[in-house]
Amino acid sequence: IVYDGHEDQPTIEGTKFYKRNGYYYIMSPAGGVKYGWQVELRSKNPYGPYEEYVGMAQGKNKKVNGPHQGAWVDTQNGEDWFLHFQDKHAYGRVVHLQPAKWVNDWLVIGDDKDGDGCGDPVQQWKKPNLPSSGNFQPKESDDFNSVDLGLQWQWNGPYSQYWYFCDAKNSKLRLYGVQQAEDVKNLYDVPNLLLQKLPTENFTATAKVKFIPNRTEAYKENDKVLGESAGMIMQGMDYAALKF
């Protein structure tokens, strides 16, 4: 053990190890996912002893909680930046790119407006001085005019190629009903849910859905199939669905 954070820096995890200007650095998140901060440890010897420093914390920024768990990166133009995530509960974990600068061989991350040596996360900043690669917008909508699913889609569990068919000729996606295991108690355990990450906290989703039950004699009761359903879902540990 080269550093024990139980007293002052609890929940040390996700560490990165660097060497710069003769110092060895261990950069780690501390304090837990929702309300933590970014800790920096440095020493001339990789086995310590280590000095400790807080390079970024939530501070007065009430919209970016727990800014930590990331990595220092530098550009070919000599700029320093820090990538980290923010936990936003049901919305997931979003990625931030924070400006950074070295002060007395400590990395101050974000904007240190009050001059205390600890940066606060920013929500807007001048982009890195790098060659332009054009505008990039992750795909959200899909007309299903390809024989493959777009990268914006993901399954709720390990998938099978027999669950779907991309009908590019007619711009349609066909999903097949899948018999679930007997011990499945709710949709959280169902693997064949086709999902996307939420694009933003407030959005509208529309889809044209045609439900064609598998009308076989073995599963037909009063002209309805037992157990089959389809529709749209807001999926998570809690979920809500509009379904047939």
What annotation goes with each model-predicted range?
Residues E7-G22, K63-N77:
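Beta-rich, blade/repeat-based domains predominating
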Residues Q98, D105-F244:
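Extracellular glycan-recognition regions
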